[in-house]
Amino acid sequence: MIERRSIINGDCLEVKKEMEDNSVDLICTDPPYKMTSRGCHGNTGGMLAKKIAMKGQVFNHNDCNVKDWMPEVFRVLKNGCHCYIMCNQINLIEYLNIATQCGFHFIKSLIWDKQSKIMGRAYMSQYEYILFFRKGAFKQVNNCGVSDI
């Protein structure tokens, strides 16, 4: 049993198994993006090419399927509470579709301006999306005068 009023910093794939239904007030997560190197889906070469080719991934849970963890996120979140999920343009549509299939209400997307550019093969990105979802009935958000960027 997880102690009440606690902030949990751990592997959600493991920790969520110990959580009761409707027991979490807020979920804020930044799942691993399906990348192998340099912000791309496939191996693009460079310094990490050999190391990544041997391991096949950069992140420990690179192969984690959103269909496996999103229903659990919905299960543990209390009704009326919010879920924020960081993602990039590659995962955006998949996260939106699966979250709404699980029962989440999509509120809006926020922009995380990182103030620095991330290297890639095309245009350099300096932002990521934060998807804002709600489970169940509306709950007031404090300080709505804050910009969404």
Regions found by a protein language model. Name each.
Residues 1-149:
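Core catalytic lobe of class I
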